[in-house]
């Protein structure tokens, strides 16, 4: 990448909003006079999340490693039981909130019940995500850098289904609440690998390196919420941005709300209607180039991807302001406002 060796790097972490956190961290460092140009972004390889041994198995392996003679090793080996080798799925552990004990899909099921969001509405939203992503392939191709896997270039998102429909999605079975649930593999975000890189800097830094800025960061907010209803996180985050800078969603020409689950986004839209003037958002205004249901949700990268997509939409459409928001596993929300330069 041509970054000089003396330039340090650091990792930030805010679950689903980690990519956005990297952007706002750069902004904070610039405000503190710690630099004027930062390479930021996020990456996630969800296909390579490991399996784990149960906690008790690790202790038995440690005992085996400490054994000093053959008899000690035999005793350590004899302590193992078949259950010790039953793997724990790392992805499932990572997507389970330790406070509520709920896996993320169960939080979406909770919202679907509380807001009366039926299976048909979720599947219709999911099918629209694929349809919009397919229609926008030409617009987004310039923001994709090809990667090579086994010598083959991948230059387009491979999760988009050109034949997705409400009828096909209706054939899928619920995966969290298997008896009465409505959340399926088709109306939630895809498990995906992905990475995003952006430059965040001052106008002077952009001029110095000969680049034209895509836009300006004008506000951002992170807010907490009930972990069992983490999907509603965008609502308090947007409200905090209003309190800080007077910005309300209806001012945005472009709006991106991450599609962790169709039920979650629809619940956010329903809750925003209760927030007062300027907060109601029509469904057709959000995620006009598709969302994570079609494109995937590589957790560490999505926040930065949404910002990049929103900036490009502003420049393609001639809009002035964009609002980007995500729910965050563990009970948070993130909202970030951009302005076209």
Could you tell me what each predicted segment is?
Residues 1-38, 48, 83-86, 99-102, ...:
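Conserved catalytic cysteine-centered active-site region
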Residues 1-68, 144-156, 249-270:
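Conserved beta-ketoacyl condensing-enzyme motif
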Residues 8-14, 38-42, 121-128, 145-149, ...:
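Beta-strand segments within the central parallel beta-sheet cores of soluble alpha/beta enzyme folds
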Residues 14-44, 52, 112-138, 197-204, ...:
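Active-site-proximal alpha-helical scaffold in enzymes
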Residues 37-110:
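Flexible glycine-/small-residue-enriched beta->alpha junction loops
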Residues 82, 90, 120-208, 270-278, ...:
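N-terminal extracellular/periplasmic Venus flytrap/periplasmic-binding protein-like
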Residues 82-94, 167-232, 236, 240-245, ...:
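Condensing-enzyme catalytic core mediating Claisen C-C bond formation in acyl metabolism
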Residues 106-109, 150, 218-294:
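Active-site pocket-lining segment
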